[in-house]
Amino acid sequence: MKNLENLEKDLKNDLKKDLKKEKPILVSFLVSGDPNIEATLKFMNALDEYCGVIELGIPFSDPIADGSTIQEANVRSLSNGYKIHQSFDVLREFRKFSDTPVVLMTYYNPIYKRGIENFVIQAKEAGANGLIIVDLPLDEAEQYRAICKKHDMGTVFLVAPNTPDERLMYSDEASTLFLYVISTFGITGARGSFEKMTFEFIARAKNLCDKNKLYVGFGISNGEHAEKIIENGADGVIVGSAFVDIIKEYGDSNETIYKLKELARELSEGIHKGYVKYNEKNKY
């Protein structure tokens, strides 16, 4: 019987094969500077082997789209004196060892204060592949999109179950990395299960959006969730609060590293199972 180390190696090899074949992936989300910036780098390195994309949140004092778990992580980071340049610094360090795509997630205010083009240039130089600005409406993003295009910075826009078809296709066209599909109404945070509406929305988005991969986020916290989302046609799952909960409980410790990797492994296995089921249902 294979030991745990060999099982981990097999899973990592399978993940690399999945990425090459464009199979569904795991996108992990972390809040930069929680509990400290040095720990953020360690957590990114720990999750890197399981993730196709890492989403790094830039702390903000009023994160309106986030639930209590991520709001509290923002508070912890800002209370420790977090500054935006630290996210760029940690990304530069991460780039010394990894080429895994990293997307910075933030709100418009911090970018506006820094200057949109200045922020994009600094993010690009640090090694970011794309940006998600949660509260920037697509209709008001023309300047931002032009600047990102000028500096070859990817853009990701969000869509929700109540997004009209025309808006859905417009968001797909405006996104250049992937489309962030919100699973349900409300804010981020773990949930017990998903409603039929979620799967109907994934099907609608898959039918209408032909440019980008569809990565589904909000409420996914375990392997069973990941399996169900992928089984219903998503190209990836975005998981944040479940990872942040671990960091809150165990802080900057080896136990945190172990728990993060354990959850990432469970999610990856769920993604693989969901992909097998999806192919079985759609092979004819």
From Swiss-Prot:
InterPro entries: Aldolase_TIM (IPR013785), RibuloseP-bd_barrel (IPR011060), Trp_synthase_alpha_AS (IPR018204), Trp_synthase_suA (IPR002028). Pathway: Amino-acid biosynthesis; L-tryptophan biosynthesis; L-tryptophan from chorismate: step 5/5. It is an enzyme of class 4 (lyase). Keywords: Amino-acid biosynthesis, Aromatic amino acid biosynthesis, Lyase, Tryptophan biosynthesis. It comes from the Archaea. Its EC number is 4.2.1.20. NCBIfam families: trpA. Belongs to the TrpA family. This is Tryptophan synthase alpha chain.
